[in-house]
C-alpha cells in the first residue's frame, strides 16, 4: 500500500520487480498504465505467480520485458507454453558477471575449495568423501571449506581439511585467488551459479555438476558426467 501511494505520486515510466512475480497480480490492477520488467533469479516454476502456465501467460501479457539469469531459467519459464511465447522478444537472458581479477597462476597453492551451504543439495556429502581420498593420497594438498549448514550435520574431519565457517564475500575472493581447484557439485538445479563463475574469474580450475544453469557459468571448466564420489575424486585427481 505504501508503494502504491508513492508510485501514484511519482508516476514512474518503468517498474522493476525482482523474483516476486505474484506482485504483478496486484500492481497491474492498481497501476495499469506502467511498464513492468520482471527479473527471475530462481526457477520460475517454483515461485508463486509463475508456477502455472496461466500465470506465465499473464506475465508475458503484462510485462514489458522478462529477464532471466540463465537460459535454463528461461527454458523453465517456457515449459508448456505456445510457440508465440517461445519466440517472444519480451524474454531475454542476462547472465550475472564477476570481476576478472589479475591472478598470478604461479602463486596458486595446492588448495581445493568448496564454497556454499554444507548440505546434500550442494553435494557437500559427495565432495567431502572424495577429498578425504585425495588428502590420503596427496599429502601436499589441502582442502578449504567455506560455509555452514547446521541442519544437515554433515561432518568430515582431517588435519588438512580446514573449515572456515561463514566468511564474507571479500574473504571468498581472497580464498579463490590462492585456490587451484574449486568444486561446485550441486545436486539441485542451480538457476545460475555465481560460486563457479567467481572461482573461474579468479583463476581456479573449476569442476561443476551438470545441473540447472551451472554449465552456463564456465567456458573451460570440467563438467561431471556422473554426480558421485568416484567421478568427483577422479576429476580432481586428473587436475
Name every feature range the model reports, one short phrase each.
Residues 221-230, 237-239:
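Conserved acidic donor-binding segment of nucleotide-sugar-dependent glycosyltransferases
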Residues 67, 104-122, 128-132:
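Conserved donor-binding/catalytic core segment of Leloir-type glycosyltransferases
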Residues 154, 211-224:
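Short acidic/histidine- and often glycine-rich active-site loop of Leloir-type glycosyltransferases
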Residues 43-44, 72-73, 91-103, 150:
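Short beta-strand->alpha-helix junction loop in the catalytic core
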Residues 26, 49, 56, 61-88:
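A short, active-site helix/loop in glycosyltransferases that binds the activated sugar's phosphate group
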Residues 17-22, 40:
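Short His-centered aromatic/hydrophobic patch
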Residues 177-191, 204:
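Acidic donor-binding loop of glycosyltransferase active sites
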Residues 152-173:
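Nucleotide-activated donor-binding/catalytic signature segment of Leloir-type glycosyltransferases, i.e.
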